[in-house]
C-alpha cells in the first residue's frame, strides 16, 4: 500500500495553490523534482521557460499586469544565479516576486563538499536584492516562510522573496498536513490622522500645488484624479505610474520629469505631494529634481521619507486609504485650476517642440503604435532608445499598461515580461518594444511564447544594427566607439524558425498596417523595423 503522506515539495505546491497561485514559471531540474511531483492536480499551471532569467522576467511581467505575485521555481546554484538579475529588477521596481529554489542537502550546506550545483551560501546570494531570503530547515518551516512572503506582498513595499529548500526537506514526509494554513493579513491602513490633517492644511494654503505619483499608487488612481481636480494641481507620474490619470486630462503632465519642460514646471511648485514613488534619478534622468517648495511624502515604506528629498510631512500608510482620508480633510470645493491647466498645455507643446531628430523618429513610430494598439492593450518595453522616448511620449491609457525595467535597467526584459504579462492577462493584446541588442539577451523565449500563447502578442524589434545608446554616449564623451556595432543574425529567419509570423515593413505606413494585422492575429508576430525604414 502506498504511503499517502505528502512530501515537503508536494505540500508546498498545495500551499501555494491555497494562496491563489495559478501560474508558476520555471525549468524542471534534478534538484526540483519533488516540486514537480506536486504540480499535477494542484490547479497550478506550469510555464516552461528556456532560461531561468526568462522565468524571472515572465513572473515580473505577470505580476505587473495582474497585480498578483509572480512565482518561479528554479534549481540550486546556476538556477539561482541565473534568476538573480530578474530578482534585482523586481527589487528595484517594487514588484512582488516569489522565487522557490532547491538547495543542496542540509547536512552538506557550507561545507564545500563539491556537490552538484553547490554554492558557499545560496541564501546570501539573493539577500541584498530581496525583502528577505530564507532557508527552510524542515518541511514545517515552509508555511511560516510563505506566510511571511505574502505579508510582504500584502502589507509592505512589495519586493521579491527567495525561499531555498534543501533536497532532503523537499523529499521529506511532512509531520502534519499544513497545506491549508493560508494566512493573509493585509495590514495597510491610512496614515496617522494628525499627519493627514497637517498635510491637508499645507495643501489648502498652497498656491501652486503639484503631485508626483508612482507605482506605489497604482491602486489609487480614482483618488489621485479626485485630488488633482480638488487642488487644481498639476499631476506628474513616474514611469511606473503611467496611466494613473487619463492622458487627455488637462492637469496631467505625464511622465515628463525626465525632460527640461518638466523640470521647469515642477520647480514652480510651492507644495509637492509625492505618492508611492521613491523619486529616484532613474525616472528623472538627472541626480535631483529642482524642488523649491515644501515636500509632502506618502509611502508604505517609511525609509523613503528622508531619502534624496527629506519631507516636511511624512504620511506613512496605504496610498488609497490615506488619499481617501486626505480628500475628506480638504474643502469640498475644487480650487481654480485655470493657471495649472494652462501650464500643462504649455508643457505639452514644449515637449513636442523640443524633440531632436532621433526622438522625432521615435515619436512617429509611437504614434503609429498608439493608433493600432487596442484600448485594453499593454506594452512591455526593453532598455532601448525607442522605449526611453516612449516613457514620456507614449499616451498610456490605463495603469499596468506600460511595463518598463526602470530602476535596475536590465537589457533582455521586454520579451519575457511581455510573455508573462500575456499569461497574467490573456484577454489583453500585448506589444513588446525591444532593440536588437536587448533582443539577443532573451530571444530564446520566443519558443515559450509560441508554445503557450493563443492570443495576440506583437514583438516590435527596433533594429538599428547597433548598441545605439552606448554608441551615442561614447560619441558625446569623445570616446571612439568600440564594441557597439555588432554583426546581427537574420532575425526574421530566427523568428520563423521558432514559429512566429514575421514581417519587415519598409515604411511607417506599412508598419501601421502590420501592427493592425498583428493585433488581429492569434499567436506571436515579429515585426522587424529597420532604422532606415522609419525616416
Report each predicted region and the residues it spans.
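Short acidic-aromatic active-site loops that bind/stabilize oxyanions
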Residues: 1-5, 135, 188-189, 354-359, ...
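Structural motif
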Residues: 213-216, 276, 382-384, 529-531
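Active-site flanking residues adjacent to catalytic metal/cofactor-binding acidic residues
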Residues: 275, 298-300, 381, 435-437, ...
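Thiamine diphosphate
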Residues: 108, 112-117, 266, 306-308, ...
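N-terminal alpha/beta PP-like core and its mobile active-site loop of ThDP/TPP-dependent enzymes
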Residues: 2-333, 368, 372-375, 454-459
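Conserved structured core elements
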Residues: 29, 221, 263, 317-320, ...
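Phosphate/pyrophosphate-binding active-site segments
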Residues: 1-3, 140, 178, 291-383, ...
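Active-site diphosphate/adenylate-binding microenvironment
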Residues: 12, 17, 27-40, 344-427
